[in-house]
């Protein structure tokens, strides 16, 4: 997947010391990440050139200059080659909820995350539009994306419940997670016709925020 995930630059809350910078990855971790990126880049290039179903695993391994064994260590199934940032995407999504500034609602935090992600996609890898077309036109990738979407929804719903003091199986948490993840797609569809994707995204999350306030305000 083209890199569209923004890196967090949120300041520390007023009066709080800045969070310590994470330790830089070691040589082994850097090499592993570079290999994974090389495999994913080679796979996406071949998929966009020839189509997902017409490219074999061995061809991808050869293009990335790795063995098929190494490829499968990083990507256990072929579909995962397209969604190589799945874990990072989920981690950033959960962090948007758990690390939001004091006083910011969960829907507002998810709105800001969605807006940052949209800006990064608009100014990021030019292959992103082609990537979306590849997923939409390939049944195996659509199915994998749907399963990934459901996993992200469940993980986000758990984080929302924990942050809001609600039961883990509260349907309101699942509903918020569902619509928060669906909002960018709905806003983009609106924007494709009317040309105001950002405004549509803000309005959608404003609606979610208003509804969420009625839930959290209950005794």
Spans of features found by a protein language model:
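Secondary-structure edge/capping motif, primarily at the C-terminal ends of alpha-helices
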Residues: 121, 163, 187-192
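Basic, helix-initiating cap at the start of DNA-binding domains
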Residues: 1-50, 54-66, 83, 92
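Short hydrophobic/aromatic patch on the recognition helix
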Residues: 66-75
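Hydrophobic alpha-helical connector segments
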Residues: 91-131
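Hydrophobic/aromatic residues within well-ordered alpha-helical segments
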Residues: 35, 85, 89, 114, ...
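Amphipathic alpha-helical packing segments from all-alpha helical-bundle domains
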Residues: 139-164, 171-178
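A secondary-structure capping/hinge motif
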Residues: 79-81
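C-terminal peripheral helix-coil segments that are non-catalytic and often amphipathic
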Residues: 1-22, 158, 193-219
């Amino acid at each position: 997947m083209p890199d569209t995930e923004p890196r967090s630059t949120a300041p520390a809350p007023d009066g709080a010391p800045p969070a310590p910078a994470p330790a830089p990855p070691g040589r082994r971790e850097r090499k592993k990440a570079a290999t994974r990126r090389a495999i994913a880049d080679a796979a996406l290039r071949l998929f966009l050139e020839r189509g997902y179903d017409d490219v074999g695993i061995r061809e991808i391994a050869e293009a990335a200059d790795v063995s098929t064994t190494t490829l499968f260590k990083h990507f256990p199934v072929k579909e995962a080659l397209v969604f190589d940032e799945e874990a990072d995407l989920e981690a950033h999504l959960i962090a948007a909820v758990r690390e939001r500034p004091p006083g910011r609602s969960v829907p507002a935090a998810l709105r800001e995350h969605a807006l940052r992600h949209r800006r990064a996609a608009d100014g990021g890898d030019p292959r992103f539009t082609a990537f979306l077309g590849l997923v939409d036109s390939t049944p195996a990738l659509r199915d994998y994306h749907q399963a990934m979407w459901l996993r992200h929804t469940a993980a986000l719903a758990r984080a929302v419940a924990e942050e809001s003091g609600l039961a883990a199986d509260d349907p309101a948490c699942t509903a918020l997670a569902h619509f928060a993840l669906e909002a960018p797609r709905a806003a983009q569809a609106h924007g494709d016709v009317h040309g105001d994707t950002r405004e549509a995204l803000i309005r959608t999350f404003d609606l979610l925020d208003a509804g969420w306030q009625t839930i959290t305000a209950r005794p």
